[in-house]
Amino acid sequence: MSRRALLRDGMLASGLMLGAPLLAACGKGNTAGPAKAGAMGAGSLRLLWVENVEFAGSYIADTNGYYKAEGFSSFTLISGGPTATPVETDLVAGKALFGISTPDLVASAVVRGGAGIKIIGAQFQKTPFALVSMADKPITTPQDMIGKKIGVQAISEPVWAAFLKANHINPNSVTKVPVQFDPLPLTTGVVDGWVGYITDEPIVLRSKGFKVVTFLFADHGYPLVGDAYVVSDKTIKEHRDAVKAFLHAQIRGWKEALADPALGARLAVEKYGKNLGLNVAVQTQESKTQNTLVLTDDTKKNGLFTMTPELIAENIAALKLGGINMTAGQIFDLSLLTEVYQENPSLV
């Protein structure tokens, strides 16, 4: 099932409910020293997708009580999925205090939907979008796609078009084959390549015995970040300490997820996604793979979720390739994360 199709279609269908009240009550202003128990009020995080290992750090933060340690009286992880409204809609409607989304979806909500929201950090320093091909007929660079048949789901077409543009490839030089959600056409030779997620199709195919090769779009001219943390402008203005407390808890959770990839996988399989029929081996491999998107040379130096000015500029340029023109200030506010690390240098 295409998560991006469901996410994008949901946004188009529901629209953005602007001006609704914020759901959770949080402490205002700046505080010094440890957070008082419950001072931040009730918190909630709307996940981008169903409760698989993608959100390992949040599961660990919740299980180990890091949200409460940062001053939240309670904290709820709200699942996404096939029937969920868009994250952006839930944020501006006050149904969730924090959310996880992608820059293109957030940018569209801001520019085309008028949403007052900002990205405050990036879980994945690189988008998981990847080109998957069979090992016996490998496609290892964008130029290798010329003359080939590439399976593209309908909802991935904007990303596909932007990726071709970034690599100066004439769309007519590649045969785009409309596909659904199952990558079976790749294994049977119907297509030569498949546009998917590095944390999804390749792992599933390998678990079934297929040998595949991949390359990330982010390594070839389309450097969007992924799983961005998003919050409303209203929350940033009125509950800044709560936002910083959330980021602090997330950092703690993800540090443990990086140290033990199997931990988040077990929590996904046995607790948070226990009704999804997840496979612990597949989830563990996904955890290991996604950790390479979380921990980079820059985040090792500057801290998890940070974005360098260069990376922000590259994201704005990539969004323009997809027809969304905006400035960095319209979509990014990394000042809260900067403050978290300034106040807690041991977190880096």
Please annotate each region the language model reported:
Residues 137, 182-277:
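Pocket-lining segment of extracytoplasmic ligand-binding domains
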Residues 17, 33-179, 184-188, 192-196, ...:
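Short, glycine-/small- and polar/acidic-enriched structural segments
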Residues 239-322:
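Secondary-structure end/capping motifs
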Residues 1-17, 21:
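N-terminal secretory signal peptides and thylakoid transit peptides that target proteins
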Residues 27-29:
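Bacterial signal peptide processing site
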Residues 309-348:
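Conserved C-terminal helix/tail region of periplasmic/extracytoplasmic solute-binding proteins
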